[in-house]
Amino acid sequence: MPALLTIVLVFAGPASPPVPPVIGSHETDPWCLQWRGTFDSGKPACSSTEIAVWSPKAKRLYLCGGPPGIVRLDWTDVASPRVDRTYEASGVTSVATHDGVVAACHGGAAPKEMGEVLLLDLDLQLLKRLPVGHGPDMLCFTPDGSRLIVANEGEPLPDGSDRPGSVSIIDLSQGPTNARCTDVTFDAPQFGIDALRKRGVLFPHPTRSAAEQLEPEYIAIEPDGSRAWVTLQENNAIAAIDLHAARVLDIFPLGTQAFASAGGGLDPSDKDGAARIQPWPVEGLLQPDSVGCFAAGGSLYLVTANEGESLADHSVRVKDLANRLDRAKPALDPSAFSDEASAGLRHARTVLSSDGLGRLEVCPLLGDDDGDGDYDRLVCFGGRSVALWKIGGSASVPTIERAWDSGSTMEREVLARTPSAFNADSEESPSMDKRSAKRGPEPEGLTIVEHGGRRLLCVGLERCGGVMMWDTSDPKAPVFAGYCSRRDPTASGPSAGDLAPEGLCVIPASSSPTGEPLLVVCNEFSGTVSLFAIEARR
């Protein structure tokens, strides 16, 4: 049975937290974020403020995360937000709204139970419950509100069983009380594990099926509502779903980030005593978390936040690869990591040192390209970037091609603007450089802002904090537009400010309490939600 759900009316919100400085912005940035206010849940470190959505109709913000489950915020006074209604539910992972309906999802009461979607009105009165797939992680409405799409991650359980991932399509055309659900699975013959693995889709377990191991994470809907694009983060892939036919069109591997390329690079060590971004002979699985979709110049584009995700039991430091192979022979192929093969970057001995690549976490399943038992390539987790993908092909046979990638901009800009936050840990301060050997800044949430005839991409950096921006009005040549952080990386507790940005959304000027477009940033670890005015300087 699902957890008991009740409605509670709350009249007072918690006090605002101390106000740390807003850092990172430069006067020369073409865009900036001006802080307007912050809601503090008073519940840090319990995922109480993960995802938020704005209802223009109710002029309220709906927030989900830890207890109580779903919160409605009255932000009429931006300096003093208050909770005016809650809905109690355990394990709520996502919330969405369209017109007069609020939708939320949560897992079953027991690990092997199916998940559930809750349909509520704007006052959080329950309208209907619908069973969906295992482990629903994210949901969103199609632009016209006729369908609700749910990504059911189906993560492995501690007992070793692996629940299948799926995508649920909920038909709302006859109203929420008459909603019907169709589950789209990944068990079609053309998506067998051998065929997908040959194309580059990552599967950590050789004996489990593709349907069990594919894990839907996040969804973007095309503007006409015909197709959904679903990230499969652990698999380093993205799936295209036909929403009318309720079927998987294709699954696309996303490839890697080449950190050895000119002008690229990363800081791979947390023990080198400094922030050092430079090219290294290593590739990064993109493994995006969130994804968005927009139309420009007659074409469709996807945008992905290439966060990365380590695989349980399949992550090892470079210096430990030889131990894992249980061999005295070097783990790295000398011919692949010689000075000549590495374009003079680093000798293999230096690569293995703790102030080189030695401490970087890599995927041992990848890199032995010739099958001789040593590694010809090193492949780590995460692209430390954001990327644009051009959608091509036809309606039933789509294609995607990477059109642009931000490369090492995230690490370089954070280092230049807020050096004490460089690759810091969101759960510890001060902690500069602590996440360098893992996945760096970990771009996670994103949103697209249409303002003043321009298109602004906002990306939250989960570990170091803050929001980085690009003007993508010309998707062929995005322009870095600015960075803003409300974190004090030298402080701890409430005075540290906003920690671990997760969900981002936009309040349009037409329904904004201040009459200007506002960016909402949910911060998972600090338990805070902050509002920023979005301003174009030129």
Model-derived segments and their meaning:
Residues 3-20:
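Bacterial Sec-dependent signal peptides at the C-terminal "C-region" and cleavage site
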Residues 17-538:
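Beta-sheet-rich non-transmembrane sensory/scaffold domains
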Residues 1-2, 6-8, 30, 342:
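Generic N-terminal initiation segments characterized by hydrophobic and/or small/turn-forming residues
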